[in-house]
From Swiss-Prot:
Keyword set, alphabetical order: DNA-binding
NCBIfam families: PRK04239.1
Top-level division of the source organism's lineage: Archaea
Protein name according to UniProt: DNA-binding protein Pisl_0441
Family matches, as HAMAP family: dsDNA_bind
A GO molecular function held by the record: DNA binding
Family: Belongs to the PDCD5 family.
GO cellular component, one term: cytosol
InterPro entries per the UniProt record, alphabetical: DNA_bind_arc (IPR022889), PDCD5-like (IPR002836), PDCD5-like_sf (IPR036883)
PANTHER family: PROGRAMMED CELL DEATH PROTEIN 5
Presence of the UniProt keyword ATP-binding in the record: no
Organism from which the protein derives: Pyrobaculum islandicum (strain DSM 4184 / JCM 9189 / GEO3)
Pfam hit, one: dsDNA_bind
């Protein structure tokens, strides 16, 4: 009968750890959602509707680029290095600059 109590304690400990893990994961997800909402509010303030639509389109195709671009736009706007609101043409120029820095050129020799 002592063995049954030991197994019960083990199961209870496993359940407790699993619950803690789930709670931590839920808290991290909640924090990520809050951060995303704050970024979205900031972007709505610094981008025109057309530029925001372009950013949303980029997010569909290349989410990692959109996230990097969001961070850069927020940094540019908060430092005053770009005039707010950023219109679609300005966003295109920023994108061109990013592409020119990250684009790789391939040369084939025959």
């Amino acid at each position: 009968m002592a063995e049954g109590g030991f197994e019960d304690r083990e199961l209870e400990e496993i359940r407790r750890r699993k619950l803690e893990e789930l709670q931590k994961r839920a808290e991290l997800e909640r924090q990520a959602q809050i951060a995303a909402a704050q970024r979205r509010v900031a972007l709505k303030r610094i981008l025109t509707p057309e530029a925001l639509a372009r950013l949303d389109n980029i997010r569909v195709v290349r989410p990692e680029l959109a996230e990097a671009l969001e961070q850069q736009l927020i940094a540019l706007a908060s430092s005053g290095r770009v005039k707010v609101p950023i219109d679609d043409e300005t966003l295109k120029k920023i994108l061109e600059a990013i592409y020119s820095q990250t684009r790789r050129e391939y040369r084939f020799r025959l």
